[in-house]
């Protein structure tokens, strides 16, 4: 079967934003204008096509990113047929993991901002994630029909708060209820949308006289930005003072792909004014799979050997599983992004991370929640594979003959835990199965059994995250559960450096004995430039002359890591530890891996007396938006919660207070902040860093460990 759309006419994009910027409505309009949906779904009716889980429809927020395949020929039919794969991403902080993993497999992003509230804390998080993966993006300032909407103010905020260079390619005509259309700065025409066909078509007219000067001014800065793309364009611009439409687009495209600029457009998705031009901008400025760098990876046999795959059907097959979803009809769906090669249904692939072969039963492409069965996928495609037995988010599925492990995704450590138990004993096993499936879908959610109490503990990124997990257990798996009080994920670290400790484990009482002996130097690991402490262990080997044979070194590392889980002060896991093994001895007969593991574990245990341990608590970055009348109460309350106020600013929606507050003080804050402000304040919170906990909290924790 030949390729139906050439790969240079593919666009794999995500629509990202903070809560309530109108992202799902924008995605809905994209599906409508590209001909997939004949009835518009509105989020506030609970009818949006991409929000296909029941909770999403009830809460009106998007939780799982659904991948949708659409086609676009341009707002005026000016292009050949382009295949646009859209991934809808959630905007709620508790689901940043979803955003992170969709950005990992995208080539470009449309970042949606609200014309009234502009750059919000969540937008900064999404922007940082997009920077991390080097994702080219365009900006769509939505909700221009809302009170207080101002396109150029949001453009200015992007520059100041996100440190990026936005280049408007449009201006808004009118604002709030008088918002009627846009000025196209490339064609220098005014665009007015047709209400009769829900904004499918528009008419072009002369620019209104009162906007002429402003349009000229912004056009010249746009042309200048395009000219800076390369010498050829710059020379032409300097000689003639002008560039053609095609040259402007080419210059802007080159600079967008290099992540130097961000083209900015505006509109109102809800009022059907502007989304077709957002799609045009996707085609004009965002990359095809062939225009992004080859994807890097390593050889499964030797992780020091680097390898890469280009977006080409002739290269060996490689793909990344970026999402696992459970479907009521077909079982497990594995969403995969194909980077190279071709895969047909019935083929076998290698899961190179787990070293297992899997047979692909069927493959489907999603059009929101309808699916179309397909026979093959090629480089650049995004599809859902059915019949995978053991695949986790972030696994590589590739050719068996030419295997590769693509770069893994980083998943954050959970910061909050609760004990969960089924309402009836009969549901115990069912609950275990349900939690196992949910953990396979969502790598930022963990399940473990507390060895002492035998309770099942679930951990996640925030209260909302865990609420939704419990809710899904009830709806999808029919398991009702009671949950305990939230527990904070405390950590511990040491304060002393260069503490040298001897670990010796000897059992020699006739017959085959045990002998392990090592000297380890412990220090606090370096923190990064933001003051964040490294999560795991930094391990180094400085043993010379074979006093400890090489094959026992991994056992020493394992012994340290296992003991780190037990902490040194109050039994919480140890982080930010650097350990260097530098001496020791062994016995020809009695030494084995187990003995060295125990010796290292014994040495680590002594840090409790010698390492100057301290307890760390998670600190959250909290941003509260409140009307001015309640500002005093909100700030007083944050101070009572041991919050450090970082700054304040005025916005259209009220005063914004930024603070860093320990997570342990934030439980139930959603209810408290609402009652303090008569329901008018809202807040968002994300993990910032670990910091030392005050002595009264440490005493209580030590007492609790008893």
From Swiss-Prot:
* Gene designation per UniProt: fusA
Q: Which family does it belong to?
A: Belongs to the TRAFAC class translation factor GTPase superfamily. Classic translation factor GTPase family. EF-G/EF-2 subfamily.
The entry's localization annotation reads: Cytoplasm
**InterPro entries, per this entry?**
EFG_II, EFG_III, EFG_III/V, EFG_IV, EFG_V, EFG_V-like, EFTu-like_2, G_TR_CS
Positions that bind GTP: 17-24, 88-92, 142-145
Q: Which UniProt keywords apply?
A: Cytoplasm, Elongation factor, GTP-binding, Nucleotide-binding, Protein biosynthesis
GO biological process entries: ribosome disassembly
> What is the predominant subcellular site recorded for this chain?
cytoplasm
What is the protein name for this chain?
Elongation factor G 1
Kindly give the PANTHER family that the UniProt entry links to this protein.
Answer: RIBOSOME-RELEASING FACTOR 2, MITOCHONDRIAL, TRANSLATION ELONGATION FACTOR G-RELATED
Its biological purpose is as follows: Catalyzes the GTP-dependent ribosomal translocation step during translation elongation. During this step, the ribosome changes from the pre-translocational (PRE) to the post-translocational (POST) state as the newly formed A-site-bound peptidyl-tRNA and P-site-bound deacylated tRNA move to the P and E sites, respectively. Catalyzes the coordinated movement of the two tRNA molecules, the mRNA and conformational changes in the ribosome.
